[in-house]
Design a protein with these regions (language model features):
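Bacterial N-terminal signal peptides that target proteins for export
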Residues: 1-9
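Sec/Tat signal peptide C-region and signal peptidase I cleavage site
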Residues: 16-22
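N-terminal (or domain-start) structured segment
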Residues: 23-91
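Bilobed "Venus flytrap"/periplasmic-binding protein-like clamshell domains
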Residues: 25-51, 56, 115-183, 287, ...
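Acidic, polar ligand-binding/catalytic clefts
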Residues: 80-117
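Pocket-lining segment of extracytoplasmic ligand-binding domains
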Residues: 85-86, 94-97, 102-103, 165-255
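A bilobed periplasmic-binding-protein/Venus flytrap-type ligand-binding module shared by bacterial periplasmic
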Residues: 116-131, 226, 246-260
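An extracytoplasmic/periplasmic, membrane-proximal ligand-sensing/linker region
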Residues: 172, 176, 182-183, 193-206, ...
Length: 317
């Protein structure tokens, strides 16, 4: 082999890892299949792939909910993105509530990337039960799901509104809510997906449901933000339904490099309008929500927000 042949072979060998490394893979931990947040994860993965010409590939992982997502952030490698209400991250970092015996210094390395549609509490009852308020849920079989923030929030509301030990809690996965409702295994279920939630659409179309509204007094008692699900959002829903909502953020950790965090954040915002054209829940996500993020933002995402002049919260840096 001549000198030039050897040089050409060496050059090709050097190029191979470069082309292979051009594709960055990111794990995106969302929620249970069939939920709003799982569908959002699918949309984000497609948007990031399209917006980066395939240079960043998001692999979507199903999850039992936000508590599991936060726990896994302490043990997963750098390119790991997960969704959670920021309140849960604060609890993890403080070693409180469900994280009391699971404190981990890695929780302090969690950083925000961008907001996604807010949690929307849905208390869904089979229409033929005749239940139209929380008092009517007494003696009924209700599915809360397992391990998710929505399940914990739902249980808190039931206790708060006088239903502690007065409803039967079904031991069924939330992903099976539609089937369980249809076959009479449960009378209702609680889900925290953004509206229009796919599992509520399925239940409303297949069985007929009533979404239980919260009064202004009940909403004030929860200390959450009031949100109104407009009439006509679901089949058979003839009136607006008042409920509560809670912000949700896509997080990563300091193990993700700045360039990847920058590219993810930039592409998310550039693709958001297209996503909103496909799914209405993205229309409510705006740059103004970034200022409400209570914790630190990843330096790569910060770079993008500073370039665009987006207002930031006091703790962002």
């Amino acid at each position: 082999m001549t000198f030039w042949s050897k040089l050409a072979v060496a050059g090709l060998a050097a190029l191979i890892p470069l082309s292979a490394s051009a594709e960055t893979r990111v794990t995106y931990k969302s929620a249970s299949a069939g939920s709003s947040y799982y569908q959002m994860g699918v949309q984000v993965a497609e948007a990031i792939k399209a917006g980066t010409d395939g240079n960043i590939i998001l692999t979507l992982e199903e999850s039992q909910g936000s508590v599991q997502n936060v726990m896994e952030s302490a043990v997963r490698p750098g390119n790991f993105v997960f969704t959670s209400p920021p309140a849960l991250v604060s609890l993890a970092q403080g070693g409180k509530a469900m994280f009391k015996d699971k404190a981990n210094p890695k929780f302090d390395e969690i950083r925000a990337l961008f907001p996604i549609p807010s949690l929307t509490m849905h208390f869904v009852m089979r229409a033929d039960t005749g239940v139209t308020d929380f008092a009517g849920m007494e003696g009924k079989t209700i599915l809360l799901g397992k391990g998710s923030f929505g399940a914990r929030e739902g249980e808190k509301y039931l206790d708060m509104f006088g239903l502690k030990d007065k409803v039967d809690l079904a031991n069924v996965e939330l992903s099976n809510a539609g089937a369980a409702l249809k076959n009479g295994q449960i009378d209702g279920f609680v889900t925290a997906g953004s509206y229009p939630a796919p599992n509520v659409i399925e239940a409303a179309a297949g069985t007929g449901v009533t979404i239980i509204p919260l009064s202004d007094e009940q909403i004030a008692e929860t200390k959450r933000t009031k949100l109104v699900i407009p009439a006509g959002t679901y089949p058979g829903q003839d009136a607006d339904v008042a409920t509560t909502s809670l912000d949700v953020i896509a997080f990563t950790t300091t193990a993700m490099d700045d360039d990847t965090a920058y590219a993810l954040t930039k592409t998310f915002w550039e693709e958001k309008a297209r996503m909103a054209g496909d799914a209405p829940w993205w229309k409510g996500v705006s740059p103004e929500m970034v200022a409400a993020i209570p914790g630190k933002i990843h330096p790569g995402a910060l770079r993008y927000y500073e370039e665009k002049g987006v207002a930031l919260g006091e703790a962002a840096k």
